[in-house]
């Protein structure tokens, strides 16, 4: 099960955070700081899976952005690693080569995409067309 999903830039600034189980706001800040430090301090040659406290961190770097997913011990690391890539492919398709600015200025749409893919910490959809369908309908409605 996914515990949290973070998008962070190289400077350590959180661009998106989504928690699938309750974490107190003060603990979130500390958790994010430690998780970001753990991922940013690693070299490209090191593994993208980290054992951290009572869960695992799986991360991928895309240009200046890191996507970090915290999961429980029973989750398949490779499945989450590929899920991260699928998420970025969906963003690329919707935004035509997604950038950090796209995420910052369209955070609501990024949350919609993530919510279509993950429900209560479980991956429920990976098909790009079905993930983007609600957003495309919203876009058509806003044009009218």
Curated annotation (Swiss-Prot):
GO terms for biological process: protein localization; protein targeting; protein transport; vesicle-mediated transport. Widely expressed. GO terms for cellular component: AP-4 adaptor complex; endosome lumen; intracellular membrane-bounded organelle; trans-Golgi network; trans-Golgi network membrane. Keywords: Golgi apparatus, Hereditary spastic paraplegia, Membrane, Neurodegeneration, Protein transport, Transport. It is a peripheral membrane protein. It is found in: Golgi apparatus, trans-Golgi network membrane. It holds the Pfam family Clat_adaptor_s. It is linked to Spastic paraplegia 52, autosomal recessive: A form of spastic paraplegia, a neurodegenerative disorder characterized by a slow, gradual, progressive weakness and spasticity of the lower limbs. SPG52 is characterized by neonatal hypotonia that progresses to hypertonia and spasticity, and severe intellectual disability with poor or absent speech development. Some patients may have seizures. Adaptor protein complex 4 (AP-4) is a heterotetramer composed of two large adaptins (epsilon-type subunit AP4E1 and beta-type subunit AP4B1), a medium adaptin (mu-type subunit AP4M1) and a small adaptin (sigma-type AP4S1). Belongs to the adaptor complexes small subunit family. Component of the adaptor protein complex 4 (AP-4). Adaptor protein complexes are vesicle coat components involved both in vesicle formation and cargo selection. They control the vesicular transport of proteins in different trafficking pathways. AP-4 forms a non clathrin-associated coat on vesicles departing the trans-Golgi network (TGN) and may be involved in the targeting of proteins from the trans-Golgi network (TGN) to the endosomal-lysosomal system. This is AP-4 complex subunit sigma-1.
């Amino acid at each position: 099960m996914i515990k949290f999903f973070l998008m962070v830039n190289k400077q350590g600034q959180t661009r998106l955070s989504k928690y699938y189980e309750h974490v107190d706001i003060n603990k979130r800040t500390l958790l994010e700081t430690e998780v970001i430090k753990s991922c940013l301090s690693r070299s490209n040659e090191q593994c993208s899976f980290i054992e951290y406290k009572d869960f695992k961190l799986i991360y991928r770097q895309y240009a200046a952005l890191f996507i970090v997913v915290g999961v429980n011990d029973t989750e398949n690391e490779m499945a989450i690693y590929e899920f991260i890539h699928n998420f970025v492919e969906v963003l690329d398709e919707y935004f035509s080569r997604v950038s950090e600015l796209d995420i910052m200025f369209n955070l609501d749409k990024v949350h919609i995409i993530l919510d279509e893919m993950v429900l209560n910490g479980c991956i429920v959809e990976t098909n790009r067309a079905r993930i983007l369908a609600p957003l495309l309908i919203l876009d058509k409605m806003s044009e009218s």
